[in-house]
Amino acid sequence: MLGLLCPVCGGRLAREKTVWRCESRHSFDVARSGYVNLLPPSASGKRHGDDKRMVAARTAFLSRGYYDHLIGAVAETCAQLAGPDACVLDAGCGEGTYTRAIYDALAAKGGCPQLLGADISAEAVRRAARQVPEGIFCAASTAHLPLAAESLDLIVNIFSPLMAEEFLRVLKPGGYLLRVVPM
């Protein structure tokens, strides 16, 4: 089970309809588009990552099919590595194109995967949450993931910075990291 953590105190978050709340009563509203902002309080009010135009440009580019082969290969590999009820993080999920394919591939195995998308760009996760309403999406830094230790079966890291120590912290023993980088 995914263990989201409070970026203020580190306590475990629980979802209460449209809010995530920890035992210390810190609360984080789920936006209408379906994502929650879990960036540290010191980062509030600042723009991080891609803006609306950059996200729209990436979405338009990916919709032209140039990366369909890669998207399919990533989704197929995820389905091979993870069980049908796996806890999976798309670290640096962007606007959710890969996340959608990953979810569909895992769900096709007949299970109920728990999929989390995290990106530092609130605009990107806003779009991702609309693309994959079955997932949990948060604006968060992959350098300081708001996740409990050893809570993930698989981390997917596509064209995003590698945060090796942080990824090792949140991966379960025997978990996998699927990384895609340009050659």
Question: Where in this protein do the model-derived segments appear?
Answer:
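N-terminal auxiliary segments of SAM/dcSAM-dependent transferases
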Residues: 1-48
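Class I SAM-dependent methyltransferase Rossmann-like catalytic core
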Residues: 49-73, 77
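Short helix-loop-beta connector
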Residues: 80-87
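Class I SAM-dependent methyltransferase SAM/SAH-binding core
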Residues: 87-89, 94-144
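A short acidic, Gly/Pro-enriched loop at the edge of an enzyme's catalytic core
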Residues: 143-154
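A short SAM/SAH-binding and catalytic strip from SAM-dependent methyltransferases
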Residues: 153-166, 181
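A short glycine-rich, Lys/Arg-flanked "PGG" loop and its adjoining helix->strand segment in the class I
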Residues: 164-176
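Conserved class I S-adenosyl-L-methionine
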Residues: 176-183
